[in-house]
């Protein structure tokens, strides 16, 4: 029995594993590759130079691999690469990259992308990320592993959201959120360490304590950013369980181009 509904359109050149399921009225473009056991919901459009891995579930009316919403785009063969075991719900839009960046939009593994999410051109989404309904990512946004973005939030282009961080719902984010930090508001401000999330992911009490100390240095001790960087670097060499996590935070702050929320 065919796994492709008779009303679906699979353009010549598309490469689908024999176990892929395609629902009614869906369209799969000629430059698309889809891995084993992935399902495509009814009326969805998968187009562009798009590669999708295994065991993904793409909901109804999703638009995956569409042209970048960038006026500089001139039909270059830019790409979208999606990993394995992602859930992409109804009416989500994910666009290919642009030549002004690396030319590729990427989505890792095991992500939970809820309805009406937008992932713009050149975004880099890690793994185990949750993007809640109506969260909107502008172009070039980077999201670290295990991050959560609340529903109806807007993220400015080129912003980075650190690993294990959390952005509350209906927030407007215009600068980077460091790893492990909770932020919320319009515009988004820091509100502590994501303690519950870190516990669920197996961070030790000592590591969480070290990150709390790092947060106080960065946000509570009335230090300039340069002064805070010095103290954070010292904390990252304390010889405890939290050294690696604090170092990841320090490296993120040091590499920020738009500046961090403060």
Curated annotation (Swiss-Prot):
UniProt catalytic activity: a (3R)-hydroxyacyl-[ACP] + UDP-N-acetyl-alpha-D-glucosamine = a UDP-3-O-[(3R)-3-hydroxyacyl]-N-acetyl-alpha-D-glucosamine + holo-[ACP]
EC number annotated for this UniProt entry: 2.3.1.129
This protein's record includes keyword Lipid biosynthesis: yes
Name of protein: Acyl-[acyl-carrier-protein]--UDP-N-acetylglucosamine O-acyltransferase
GO CC terms of this entry: cytoplasm; membrane
An annotated Gene Ontology molecular function: acyl-[acyl-carrier-protein]-UDP-N-acetylglucosamine O-acyltransferase activity
Keywords: Acyltransferase, Cytoplasm, Lipid A biosynthesis, Lipid biosynthesis, Lipid metabolism, Repeat, Transferase
Keyword field contains Plastid: no
Gene: lpxA
Pathway the protein takes part in: Glycolipid biosynthesis; lipid IV(A) biosynthesis; lipid IV(A) from (3R)-3-hydroxytetradecanoyl-[acyl-carrier-protein] and UDP-N-acetyl-alpha-D-glucosamine: step 1/6
Record-linked CDD domains: LbH_UDP-GlcNAc_AT (cd03351)
Family membership noted in the UniProt record: Belongs to the transferase hexapeptide repeat family. LpxA subfamily.
SUPFAM superfamilies (UniProt xref): Trimeric LpxA-like enzymes
The protein's enzyme class: transferase
Subcellular location, principal: cytoplasm
Function according to Swiss-Prot or TrEMBL: Involved in the biosynthesis of lipid A, a phosphorylated glycolipid that anchors the lipopolysaccharide to the outer membrane of the cell.
A GO BP annotation: lipid A biosynthetic process
Species per Swiss-Prot/TrEMBL record: Burkholderia thailandensis (strain ATCC 700388 / DSM 13276 / CCUG 48851 / CIP 106301 / E264)
Compartment list: Cytoplasm
């Amino acid at each position: 029995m065919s796994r492709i509904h008779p009303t679906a359109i699979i353009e010549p050149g598309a490469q689908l594993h024999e176990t892929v399921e395609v629902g009614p009225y869906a369209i799969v473009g000629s430059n698309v590759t889809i891995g084993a056991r992935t399902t495509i919901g009814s009326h969805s459009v998968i187009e562009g130079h798009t590669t999708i891995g295994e065991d993904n579930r793409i909901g109804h009316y999703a638009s995956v691999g569409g042209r970048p919403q960038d006026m500089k785009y001139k039909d270059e063969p830019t790409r979208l690469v999606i990993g394995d075991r992602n859930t992409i719900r109804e009416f989500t839009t994910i666009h290919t990259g642009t030549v002004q960046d690396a030319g590729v939009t990427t989505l890792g593994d095991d992500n939970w992308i809820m309805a009406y999410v937008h992932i713009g051109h050149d975004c880099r989404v890690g793994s185990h990320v949750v993007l809640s309904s109506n969260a909107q990512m502008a172009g070039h946004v980077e999201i670290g592993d295990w991050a959560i973005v609340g529903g109806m939030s807007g993220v400015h282009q080129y912003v980075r959201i650190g690993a294990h961080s959390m952005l509350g719902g209906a927030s407007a984010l215009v600068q980077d959120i460091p790893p492990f930090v909770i932020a919320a508001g319009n515009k988004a401000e820091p509100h502590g360490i994501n303690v519950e999330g870190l516990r669920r992911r197996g961070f030790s009490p000592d590591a969480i304590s070290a990150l709390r100390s790092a947060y106080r240095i960065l946000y509570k001790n009335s230090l300039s950013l340069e002064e805070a960087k010095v103290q954070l670097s010292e904390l990252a060499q304390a010889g405890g369980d939290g050294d690696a996590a604090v170092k990841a935070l320090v490296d993120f702050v040091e590499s920020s181009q738009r500046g961090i929320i403060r």
